Amino acid sequence: MESAASHIIVRTPVIDSIGELYETRGLGKKSVVLFDENTRKLYGDKIIASMQRQGFRTVELVVPARETSKSVSTAWKLYGQMIETDVDRSWNLLCVGGGVVGDLGGYIAASYYRGIPVVQLPTTLLAMTDSSIGGKVAINHPLGKNLIGYFHMPALVLIDPAFLRTLPAREIFGGMAEVVKYGFIADRKFFDMLAEHWDEVTRLEEPWISDAVSRSAFTKADVVEKDFRETSGLRATLNFGHTFAHGLEKMAEYRNLRHGEAVTIGMACALYLSYRLGFLAEAELNEGLALIARFRFPRNLVNKRFISLDLEELFDAMHSDKKKIDKQLRFVLLDRIGHAFLHDREVPKADVLHAIDDAQRWFSEKR
């Protein structure tokens, strides 16, 4: 497999050189451009005009800006639009948006004509640092999130931190969950930088925000390159906090709780579980929680979507997670800040429930 990092370009403004960048990857200038309703309104005219000036032929597709767009019915509709406009395997697909557009577009690209190239142009912090990188693309099923999909590496990931300036604070803090995750699982120095310059990063100040985005993106790319299909357990460490998070998202019926918010809560649960099982020292537990305490949530969200939840119901919801094997939940844990591992033994249910309860109590005290 080619280096995942070699496909990542971090540049402002990135769209002005898209033709040149496509040429470096051997991509043609016939592009289906997939937006959601928000990204089409914010960036669509500028992106399409720039591409056409650079000699591109484009077909635009637009989907609603919500998680429910990641569905078989939406994909089927988009396939039809592509067929009707004579899109063949000589085309590529450019995804302009956050995780929903990136996942949906990647899924369509992986399956259309048995696979056409996909280029990711992420516009959210979460997509820039996580979902656009690594080639995992999927749609949802009523019984679980991201259950139907492919591994389909993007030909390019074009990251422009300037897009972040249009985002509300809730989106920034949601994206910071994945940024902080990389410090927890792989880079103690990065964790320390985030702790020291949290305000500058979350205010999108330079050079801090570009540094945080770049380090996150290239950390994920490095992990993906070493374990593309999750055979060694290394790539699974990218799911730190996610087993809990997917249960939270399912209980919220994939509404009113952003993925990054669920991951933030999930990381607190995972810290407590790492400590309860004897892997993480108390001092590092507290250090990790201190950084999580700096996240901001909408009023009453944590109480409604986590603190008030029944432990048993959340535990049951977690079993829809893709990381379980033979109905056994698998957890990514820390043995120190900066190093994670996939715990390949069954964790007693009582310990999982205690960790959730500890996190509920901690969040309750912090609110």
From Swiss-Prot:
Primary localization: cytoplasm
Gene3D superfamilies on file: 3.40.50.1970, Dehydroquinate synthase-like - alpha domain
EC number: 4.2.3.4
CDD domains: DHQS (cd08195)
UniProt keyword Zinc, yes or no: yes
Binding site for Zn(2+): 178, 242, 259
GO BP, one annotated term: aromatic amino acid family biosynthetic process
Domain of life: Bacteria
Binding site for NAD(+): 99-103, 123-124, 136, 145, 163-166
Protein name per the record: 3-dehydroquinate synthase
Source organism of this protein record: Chlorobaculum parvum (strain DSM 263 / NCIMB 8327) (Chlorobium vibrioforme subsp. thiosulfatophilum)
